[in-house]
Amino acid sequence: MTATSIRFWILVSTAGVLMAAVLALHSNNASPSKPKEPWKTGYWIWAGEPPASTGFESQILYVEAPGNRWPHDLPVSEQYVVVKRIEPGPELTSETASSLVESYNALTEDAGSRVSIAGLQIDYDCPTNRLEDYGRFLKQVRTSLPPGSRLSITALLDWFSPKTKVRSALRWVDEFVPQFYDAGPSRTSAGIAEPIDVRKWAPIFNAYEVPYRVGISSFGRIARRRTDGSGHSVVRYFRDASPLDFVGRRELTRTTSATEAGELVVHYDVVAPIEGKAELLPGDTVDITLPTEASVRAASDAAHQFGGYSAGILFFRWPSRSETLTLLPDDVQRIVSGESPRTEAKLEVSEPRCIERQCSDLYLDLGPGIFDADRAVAIRATGPVELFLPDGPLHPLALRPSQISVRVPAYAGLGKVYLGRAISSGPVRFEVVPQ
């Protein structure tokens, strides 16, 4: 054998060893690629108050179901996914995995064959340094789920930092949902949505070859920020408050700003004690973050550019009936489809049963736009109203037997507001008078 041939075989052998090492490394670290999924736009819907009624039919709804009974007051959707929330703290055990699957099986059985349930999503904010443990837990869930049931997880953006064990989790799931909201290490009083940098995130997510849907914020929040003597800020969230609780108060001064993601933030500085509001003290700031057409459209446009294994958008969330901080799905759909969202208020009427009289409960849908000035809304009845019982935060007035007047203050929020009950001797239709 010549010196040249010896060198050739040494090079071949070395290349073979290197190739084997690369293949071994790939097999140990990479999750197997999953089939791509069709694009769908969906919503998370959270347990609690009944969901807002709307004629909009979603492609897919991710339903938080804390018990073992399937909620039967859900909006119509082509498909549903069961969501189980795991709070941070307790160790994830095999018993926890078994309990999740047992609850999922009970829910699918209770829902019946007429409800199309695609699978289970686990909503768990796993610490990044525990992703390997989370992967072992997901393996237990995956192997216990019935055949054909898909497994999805929510995902924190921090998981995708360099040198994490995120593959340990992704290898066992059919889908992950990176959440582009509340992405910081701690929640702040103002701002929710995270600007979506497609050039940064698309290559990262697509490299795992696992389908994903992008989680986008369509909700708002009210928070109080209080600074102590050392300059440290403490944030408290007001979960049952409405923007209408703060408008028109002399004890508050108002300013506004926009977040980097395009949300509107209405700031109220407390300048004097407020009667009946012991939780607010002079020096406090109340920050109201509201989603806007700009914030939702920018996020949706970005999500459509991901390509690869991107399989859609999930909006957090479908609002309840009494919310004034969250965009209605109808309005979200208009925004993401490129249409101009409506600017006018809309009236909704329900007819409860009353003895010997016609009763009509009136709700004013404020629309998706945030107005920076007060506006007047006139409601006209096609016949005489014998009695109008005003209720709710807007304090409407019956000016004439067939007309009701409502003043909607600036920055009143989103969603539907109850106006009161109209009582008449016979059927009466109500409509908003064009301005």
Question: What name fits each language-model region?
Answer:
Residues R69-P71, A97-E109, G135-R142, P195-F205, ...:
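Generic structural signal for well-ordered alpha-helices
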Residues F219, T227-P341:
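Substrate-binding cleft of secreted/luminal carbohydrate-active enzymes
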Residues M1-G16:
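N-terminal Sec-pathway targeting helices
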Residues P35-A47, E64-V173:
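Chitinase-like catalytic core of GlcNAc-active glycosidases
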Residues Q358-P368:
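Short, well-ordered beta-strand segments enriched in hydrophobic/aromatic residues
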Residues K139-V247:
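Substrate-binding surface in catalytic domains of secreted glycosidases
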Residues G367-Q435:
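C-terminal beta-sandwich/jelly-roll accessory domains of carbohydrate-active enzymes
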Residues A20-K36:
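Membrane-interface motif at the C-terminal end of an N-terminal transmembrane signal
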